[in-house]
Design a protein with these regions (language model features):
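Structured, contiguous alpha/beta core segments that scaffold functional sites
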Residues: 1-266, 291, 376-406
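C-terminal helix-loop subdomains that flank or include functional centers
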Residues: 11, 16, 38-39, 92-107, ...
Length: 406
């Protein structure tokens, strides 16, 4: 395969991203002198990652969406041994295809973008798939390559890699042919990167985190009131004032709330006193936290019962199954198709086999099934072996006298 050579030039001083001067492509340089910024300062993925590690409800929704979209594994037809092998071993690192899909689903839920590297050779004798952390990937200015770097806040061109966007392959120094798939959620006015669906609720995620932090602060303060300590004392210097304040702090040692010490000239008598600051708005904080959680669920297009967020009326298996069915048809199945469709194309292009039978096994979070379902249908829904021609599996679940747990 011919090598792709591209010249480089120095980036403008105001560009925070260093010009890309190196590549793993044999004898070639990086496809662009810089990348399209992901966010105003090219650090938006870092900010989104930080929020996801601080907001409890936000993180739970992200985790659950990825779990449901990745399903219980992947299956294919019996006449596809190469695809079956890829399902079990997607790469040389021991990842299954389900592992890869789960990471892609998580990245797309968190960033609105996901990246999948495809590796083969000139003879197409093998296929390996590698997930790449989306926060380490940027679109090159030629819009035909993805630049990978481990730390975009301290870019070093010698550590950068360049991979062409699918369907273009480029030969690497190890003799392999590689390309990369870029998944991105569509958003008007955004061409180079997708936008996470929950972006309108980023402030809500921050509110949920800050209300949790406020509760931690109250716990650290042993729920003691904050306030102002008025001290009557005559001081001749700043040092004397500091000494008196330290003595007061020692006297009120322990783990009190935040106390402001104020020294004033001593009048007749000792009028030193503590003026508490009452937090009579605890209910408002709770309401704010609840509203933030509700906004997050709405922005994620998700459902409370599927992420362990309780209703005021409690949980029920019927509600969980109902919300799962809605989520399956409105969120899970479309996301699965978005992730699997390019993978099927890669399999067909590289291995030359039909991958149309590749699909994800979906299973509801509870075992309850309608009694009009046949046994083979129930086993199929649970990802178990089934035989439509088996007379016993043609029976309805109702004939068993109870809801099947097969």
């Amino acid at each position: 395969m011919s090598e792709h050579r591209i010249a480089t030039r120095i980036a403008a001083p105001e560009n925070r991203v260093e010009p890309l001067l190196g590549s793993t492509v044999a004898g070639a340089s990086v496809a662009s002198d810089r990348v399209w910024h992901w966010g105003d300062d090219n650090m938006l993925p870092y900010a989104l990652s930080l929020i996801s590690r601080r907001s409890v409800a936000h993180r739970r929704i992200l985790n659950d969406k990825a779990d449901y979209i990745a399903g219980k594994g992947l299956v294919c037809g019996d006449n596809s041994p190469l695809v079956s092998h890829l399902i079990v071993s997607a790469n040389g690192e021991g990842d299954t295809l389900r592992d890869i899909v789960h990471r892609l689903a998580f990245d797309e839920a968190l960033f609105g973008n996901a990246f999948l590297e495809v590796v083969t050779d000139a003879e197409h004798s093998f296929l390996a798939l590698y997930h790449h952390d989306a926060s380490k990937c940027r679109v090159a200015r030629d819009s035909e390559h993805i630049i990978l770097h481990h730390n975009w806040s301290a870019f070093n061109s010698s550590d950068a890699r360049s991979l062409p966007l699918f369907p273009r392959f480029e030969e690497q120094t190890d003799g392999t042919l590689r390309t990369i798939l870029h998944y991105k959620d569509y958003e008007p006015m955004f061409q180079h990167y997708g936008v996470a669906g929950y972006l309108a609720a980023v402030d809500a995620a921050a509110i949920a985190y800050k209300t949790d932090k406020w509760n931690i602060s109250r716990l650290d303060n042993a729920f003691q009131l904050s306030g102002v300590m008025m001290l009557d004392s005559v001081v001749d210097s700043e040092a004397e004032a500091d000494r008196i304040v330290r003595m007061a702090e020692e006297k009120f040692a322990g783990n009190p709330g935040q106390v402001l010490f104020v020294l004033r000239d001593k009048a007749e008598g000792d009028n030193s006193r503590f003026i508490p600051i009452n937090t009579a708005t605890d209910g408002d904080w709770h309401t704010l936290h609840t509203q933030a959680e509700n906004d997050l669920i709405i922005a994620h297009s998700w459902f409370r019962s599927l992420s362990g967020l309780d209703y005021s009326s409690g949980f029920s298996s019927e509600r969980i199954l109902h919300e799962y069915e809605v989520a399956l048809n409105t969120v899970i199945l479309p996301e699965q198709e978005q992730l699997l469709s390019p993978i099927r194309k890669v399999i067909e292009l590289v291995l030359g086999v039909d991958a149309s039978s590749l699909e994800i096994v979906n299973r509801p979070p509870t075992r309850s099934k309608p009694q009009y379902m046949r046994i083979w249908e129930a086993r199929k829904a649970d990802g178990l072996d089934y035989d439509e021609s088996d007379p016993e599996q043609q029976q309805f679940l109702a004939s068993l006298g109870k809801t099947s747990n097969t």
